[in-house]
């Protein structure tokens, strides 16, 4: 709601003359006051009717990915490639179909000669690993194309299935003499390693010396009684002692 504009009309105000004594007439200027709402609300005119939030639909990440013209050949969760071959399409076009049928995996596997097998099946015969003469049409067991590569010898356990021939038994024939543990070997004494600078002085032996050691003698009594000066000098300098070694 717009407020009315206030217009102030010009007025004549008498004023005394300072010098001549005649009154002067002063005319006030016409001032137009604009209300504050109209002066500060100019931005309201630029506001238009806008839709509320949620009016527009924003495409999600999945929808954006489906709009990609390039077909993906991978997927998440480690599922691998899932691009359908031409023969498994829902609406195949005759020009897209191959001109031949691909061979089966089992047929290709049967044509290959396997040199190994699973744990519960024995290995193939070595004679089947070589090229055969297709012109031979004999029953099994009537001929031997190739001899056995290594003569087989019986083993005690199924774990040792080596086809290599063992050592001949003549190396392990018993000999005369005591068996292991029936005698004791006498090892020759070995000299200890010593230094050339070894001291020859005997260790921890009594030393035959006539020099008395500490405590081997006792002080003798001063008899007759000496003066205090001589007795003091005897105690300080050990002038009077009695050797108890007895030599």
Curated annotation (Swiss-Prot):
GO terms for cellular component: cytoplasm; female germ cell nucleus; female pronucleus; germinal vesicle; male germ cell nucleus; male pronucleus; nucleoplasm. Keywords: Chromatin regulator, Cytoplasm, Developmental protein, Nucleus. Transmembrane segments: none annotated. Expressed in ovary and testis. Expressed in spermatocytes I in the pachytene stage, round spermatids, and elongated spermatids. Expressed in the germinal vesicle (GV) stage and stage 2 meiosis (MII) oocytes and pre-implantation embryos until blastocyst stage (at protein level). Disruption phenotype: No visible phenotype. Mice were born at the expected Mendelian ratio and show no overt phenotype. Zygotes however display strongly reduced levels of 5-hydroxymethylcytosine (5hmC). The keyword Chloroplast does not apply. One of its GO terms (molecular function) is chromatin binding. It holds the Pfam family SHIPPO-rpt. InterPro entries: SHIPPO-rpt. GO terms for biological process: epigenetic programing of male pronucleus; pyrimidine-containing compound catabolic process. It is found in: Cytoplasm; Nucleus. Interacts with histone H3. Interacts with histone H4. Interacts with METTL23. Maternal factor that plays a role in epigenetic chromatin reprogramming during early development of the zygote. Involved in the regulation of gametic DNA demethylation by inducing the conversion of the modified genomic base 5-methylcytosine (5mC) into 5-hydroxymethylcytosine (5hmC). This is Protein STPG4. It comes from Mus musculus. The lineage of its organism: Eukaryota, Metazoa, Chordata, Craniata, Vertebrata.
